[in-house]
Amino acid sequence: MLNVPSQAFPAPGSQQRVASQGRSKVPLKQGRSLMDWFRLTKSGKDFTGLKGGLIEVTEEELKKHNKKDDCWICIRGFVYNVSPYMEYHPGGEDELMRAAGADGTDLFNEVHRWVNYESMLKECLVGRMAVKPAVPKDCHEGKRVLNGMLPKSQVTDTLPREGPSSPSYDWFQTESSVTIVIYTKQKNINLDSVIVDLQDDSLRAEAVIKDHSYLIHIGLSHEVQENFSVRVIENVGKIEIVLQKKETVSWKCLGDPLEKHDSFIPKKDTGLYYRQCQLISKEDVTHDTRLFCLMLPPSTHLQVPVGQHVYLKLSVTGAEIVKPYTPVSESLLSDFKEPVLSPNKYIYFLIKIYPAGLFTPELDRLQIGDFVSVSGPEGNFKVSKLQEVEDLFLLAAGTGFTPMVTVLNHALTHMSSLRKVKLMFFNKTEDDIIWRCQLEKLALKDKRFHVEYVLSAPSPEWNGKQGHVSRALLSEFLQRSLENSKVFLCICGPTPFTDEGIRLLHDLNFSDDEIHGFTA
């Protein structure tokens, strides 16, 4: 329970208490309607001063913010800075001030139970009330585990001085399920920020928060079903993992901590974790490139973010060989729709087979039903780089096309500011062009998309562009839709191609902030 001071609200004798089953509205100034408020919240203004971050708020801190120009209110465990909302509150500023610096949950429920406050005040969210968990009985002697929290003495303090606030977690249960809740203290957490693996009643859940990784790693105290669900409440930065019990017994505790449990460290310092994925299909795309489909285990939740890669691992002549590959969609045409919320259990890869190579021939020899080890996502591409971009240019050579697939998908389905996206695709011959037919169908389907091919060893019949990446080719290709339109460029291919391309882009006066080079 929250021990936060409560206030009488509405005040005795106030219009809101006198009115039967409701409240009297207070006349608002011009331009202070609910629609005006929603417009203001979409303006991008920072209403909390936390720049999108979330904090844990103590009772003492909450009490300090009790003035009209600095008013925090706690509703159902979450703290909001309602100062910007004062002039927009239909019940008037004075009534809102009754809960200033206090827990307004009961007051809110009495008058506003029907209101979707999470949506209306989401831009005012400061964070979550700090709650001191109760200590239940130990699961096993000598392993003291709190109700979803390890004692501070057992937690490695790996949080650097700079970086996001350390997350926390808790858990609760019903007769048939156990729910683990991770409080990330950051807004805009997505399903692809969460990776969950359940194996032999060992739970491993990783939340990627900016450039850090928070890990829950527990040997569960009881058996659970292999299927589970993951839910993300983006605007409050909350992750819920719901496990189904095998037996309807009451758990005294969640379980025992395993390696690196409750750790929060820079992502670059975490090791790769692999799970076994089954080969479901493989089909020819070109004379030397295949489309591989791998199925995740039913006890895994993993979605690869746009433009990021994973590592595939095989045992070759007694040695483990690891190679990075960027997942793609099954097809350029079928995937251009809103994604479903349920996790996708299949991962697709476009992989060129090198007959003299060590890894790809072994991969190509796998039979349907065989297994490949797949790591979690890696990479530094962030879709936030594409925010408000109007002209997107993609430069790809060979299988450097693969990261462009998800970038292209995201651009055409989620970027409302986009005027055009152009792909310049470098290959040796026409036979090497991956998904050429699909690219041309997509260009017909969506007029914002345009593709140009450049061949280094074309046939005599080829009428298109030829050669290698050059200043002349790029200066002609990189034409903005408007003189001052916001642009972004992605480039991927063999290292010499990428390095030369970035050098040429700099020569053409594009800045580092406008360029992303994909490297593994």
Swiss-Prot record:
Output the SUPFAM superfamilies linked to this UniProt entry.
Answer: Cytochrome b5-like heme/steroid binding domain (SSF55856), Ferredoxin reductase-like, C-terminal NADP-linked domain (SSF52343), HSP20-like chaperones (SSF49764), Riboflavin synthase domain-like (SSF63380)
The record ties this protein, via InterPro entries, to: Cbr1-like_FAD-bd_dom, CS_dom, Cyt_B5-like_heme/steroid-bd, Cyt_B5-like_heme/steroid_sf, Cyt_B5_heme-BS, Cytochrome_b5/Flavoprotein_Rdt, FAD-bd_FR_type, FNR_nucleotide-bd
Expressing tissues: Isoform 2 is expressed in testis, brain, skeletal muscle and in the male germline.
Cofactor(s) listed: FAD
Residues covered by the CS domain: 164-255
Task: Name the reported effect of H112 to A/M.
Answer: Abolishes heme-binding but does not affect reductase activity
Q: Which PANTHER family match?
A: CYTOCHROME B5 REDUCTASE 4, CYTOCHROME B5 REDUCTASE 4 FAMILY MEMBER
Family statement: Belongs to the flavoprotein pyridine nucleotide cytochrome reductase family.
Name of the protein: Cytochrome b5 reductase 4
The beginning of the lineage is:
Eukaryota, Metazoa, Chordata, Craniata, Vertebrata
